A protein has these predicted regions:
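Histidine/cysteine-enriched polar flanking segments
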Residues: 1-144
Length: 144
C-alpha cells in the first residue's frame, strides 16, 4: 500500500500510476487532488551486485543446509515511493528518488532527503523502517 497510495495531507493523494487507476481507486478519493507518479529511480547497480554476489550465494547455502530465509529476495524499485510524512507539509524521502522529490517540492512540500543504503535488500522503505511516531498535532479526519 505504501508504494501505491500515499495520503499526503487532507485532499491530496500520491498514486503509483502503474498500480492505481481511475478504475480501481476507492471512491473515497474521487474528490481529492491526485498526483499520478511512476518515475521511481531504478535499483542501483551496487545493490543488484550486492544481491547477486553476496545475498544470493548465502541464501543458496542456507537453503542447502535446510534453513529458509528472505536473502534471495529483493524489494521492487517501487519501494522508493515508501516515504514518511512528518506533517502535512514535510516528508522524508530516499535521496535517490530525485524525480519524486521534484514532484513533491513542486507541490510545496518540504522534502528531507535521506540515504537508505540497503532499501531494496531489506524489504521496505523509510515508512516501513520507522518505529511508531507520536505527532504533536490535532487529530484530523482526512475523509469527511
Amino acid at each position: 500500500l505504501d508504494s501505491t497510495v500515499m495520503c499526503l495531507k487532507p485532499g491530496l493523494v500520491l498514486l503509483n500510476s502503474k498500480r492505481a487507476s481511475k478504475d480501481n481507486l476507492p471512491e473515497i478519493f474521487n474528490k481529492w487532488d491526485k498526483i499520478w507518479f511512476d518515475d521511481v529511480a531504478p535499483t542501483s547497480e551496487e545493490e543488484l551486485n550486492f544481491q547477486k554476489d553476496i545475498r544470493d550465494p548465502v541464501a543458496k547455502e542456507l537453503s542447502r543446509m535446510g534453513f529458509s530465509s528472505n536473502l534471495g529476495s529483493m524489494s521492487s524499485p517501487w519501494v522508493g515511493m515508501n516515504f514518511l510524512s512528518l506533517d502535512p507539509e514535510t516528508v522524508i524521502v530516499d535521496e535517490r528518488q530525485e524525480n519524486l522529490i521534484k514532484v513533491l517540492e513542486k507541490r510545496k512540500f518540504t522534502v528531507i532527503p535521506v540515504r537508505m543504503r540497503h532499501i531494496y535488500t531489506q524489504g521496505g522503505g523509510i515508512h516501513c523502517a520507522t518505529l511508531d511516531t507520536i505527532r504533536e498535532s490535532k487529530l484530523e479526519d482526512y475523509f469527511s
